[in-house]
UniProtKB/Swiss-Prot annotation:
It catalyses: UDP-N-acetyl-alpha-D-muramate + L-alanine + ATP = UDP-N-acetyl-alpha-D-muramoyl-L-alanine + ADP + phosphate + H(+). Belongs to the MurCDEF family. The keyword Nuclease does not apply. This is UDP-N-acetylmuramate--L-alanine ligase. It comes from Chlorobium luteolum (strain DSM 273 / BCRC 81028 / 2530) (Pelodictyon luteolum). GO terms for biological process: cell division; cell wall organization; peptidoglycan biosynthetic process; regulation of cell shape. Cell wall formation. Its EC number is 6.3.2.8. The gene is murC. NCBIfam families: murC. InterPro entries: Mur-like_cat_sf, Mur_ligase_C, Mur_ligase_C_dom_sf, Mur_ligase_cen, Mur_ligase_N, MurCDEF_pg_biosynth, UDP-N-AcMur_Ala_ligase_MurC.
Length: 473
């Protein structure tokens, strides 16, 4: 059967970020889509509005009459009744990334990989291409207001994809341009060692055809260490390290950055980015280098970067008022991401009090990185650590591991006003009290984590709005 003859696709775990994005892409491409998840909500409601059939819970009969079943790495195929029924009935069962790889066959693929920043960089590339008159197909593991969602089905030849390294998913993709945005220890439950993770990044980059290109962000030491193993055409980007594409004359001011890009010896001054942080400038350099490789005029690329307005849960300002109180929601869940997010708040609003509200994600990650979280959070004026968000893990498998490990690490690193508050209501009250404290330079309530801390951020934004300023979901 050819993909074009496939009529109905059933997706197990359709409510997840990556799965809902591919469901949206399939719907917009004309496929009939059904899907199941243990819980439903805003994401599945939106898919239903686009025509998907959504089931709450998993039942064998829900895969009847479908042509293929797609599932994510978070689903155990041997423990899911729908997958078992599909296999018994002779219905093909594939992982999400295999389906994505099939959809890429008809396009020139631009794939952004990295342990950090890939969502933002993918969205920047998509914004630049659209603003330059291209009509790309786009799939991102996050929500962009500019794109009005996480996917775009375009008529042009380019497909821009966020390439996830978890479970080696990105190795099933076929990029023409591969962006290596960052690389450090992550997903050790998949890889076991950093060396094994690096080998997968090398394999991913070398999947690029001889006429393609690999964009490497060399400010990351582990990327510098693997460059010698990449046998494709390379472009390097960096701020701290010598590179083909660099940034200088950097000025940060209240959530905006202006700078000069120097690409292959030519200066392009006056670049404006409407999101804070040096890490976002580095992301912009990767996007700019990608645009140059596609032959787009630099002036159009710069204009496109100026239109980039951020992603939901990537330093998303959910509330601000005239007193300088801000509620910011960010997906940061790795120590490097937490450090960059706190630093962005500090550099963008140097006179403000920064109160970090951090929810550790996964017991295994909390155990592995507790000390690193301590250093990353210690630059905030106050730190509240929530209970660990378990996701796919169980507390009983990690005795003694909780948010207290992170709180103690923050204290050892010199952090001020540190508290571990596992009770949600107590945490809500404490954060609201912080927001009510007068501060001459304002107060930033900075929520970070990959779990449901975003729900608390939304509630705080609603509580403090009081009719002044603006609150956003």
């Amino acid at each position: 059967m050819e993909l074009g003859k496939t009529k109905r696709v059933h997706i197990v775990g359709i409510g997840g970020a990556g799965m809902s994005a591919i469901a949206e892409l399939l719907l917009k491409s004309g496929f009939a889509v059904s899907g199941s998840d243990l819980s439903t909500g805003e994401v599945t409601d939106k898919l239903q509005q686009h025509g998907a059939v959504i089931y709450r819970g998993h039942e064998a009969g829900q895969v009847a009459d479908c042509d293929v079943v797609v599932y994510s790495s978070a689903v155990r195929p041997d423990a899911n009744v729908e997958i078992s029924e599909a296999l018994k009935s002779g219905i093909p069962v594939v992982k999400r990334d295999e389906m994505l790889g099939e959809l890429m066959r008809y396009k020139s693929g631009i794939c952004v990989a990295g342990t950090h920043g890939k969502t933002t960089t993918t969205a920047m590339i998509a914004t630049m291409l659209i603003e330059s008159g291209e009509s790309p197909t786009v799939m991102i593991g996050g929500v962009s207001d500019y794109l009005k969602g996480s996917t775009v089905v375009g008529e042009g030849r380019y497909m821009v994809i966020e390439a996830d390294e978890f479970d080696r998913a990105f190795l099933r993709l076929t990029p023409t341009i591969a962006v290596l945005n960052s690389l450090e220890s992550e997903h050790m439950d998949t890889y076991g060692t950093l060396d094994e993770l690096k080998r997968s990044f090398i394999e991913f980059a070398n999947k690029v055809p001889f006429y393609g290109r690999v964009i490497c962000s060399v400010d990351w030491p582990e990327i510098r260490r693997i460059i010698g193993s990449l046998n494709r055409r390379l472009t390097t980007v960096g701020i701290e390290e010598p590179a083909d594409v660099t940034a200088g004359d950097i000025v940060m001011d209240h959530g905006r950055a202006t700078f000069t890009i120097t690409a292959f010896g030519t200066d392009y001054p006056g670049v404006c980015l409407n999101v804070p942080g040096r890490h976002n400038i580095l992301n912009a350099l990767s996007a700019f280098a990608t645009g140059l490789e596609l032959g787009i005029e630099p002036e159009r690329l710069i204009a496109g970067l100026g239109r980039y307005s951020g992603m939901r849960r990537r330093f998303q300002v959910k509330f601000r008022d005239s007193r300088g109180l801000m509620v910011i929601d960010d997906y940061a869940h790795h120590p490097s991401e937490v450090k960059a997010t706190v630093k962005a708040a500090r550099s963008g609003w140097p006179d403000a009090r920064v109160i970090a509200v951090f929810q550790p994600h996964l017991f295994s990650r909390t155990l592995e990185f507790a000390d690193e979280y301590g250093w990353a959070l210690s630059r905030a004026d106050g730190v509240y650590v929530a209970a660990v968000y378990p996701s796919r893990e169980k507390q009983e498998d990690f005795p003694g591991v909780d948010g207290a490990l992170v709180a103690e690490a923050v204290r050892r690193a010199g952090g001020r006003q540190v508290a571990f508050v596992p009770d949600r209501d107590e945490l809500l009250a404490a954060v609201l009290n912080e927001g009510a404290e007068p501060a001459p330079g304002g107060t930033i309530l900075l929520f970070m984590g990959a779990g449901d801390i975003t729900v608390l951020a939304t509630e705080v934004a609603g509580r403090v709005s009081g009719g002044e300023g603006h609150a956003r979901a």
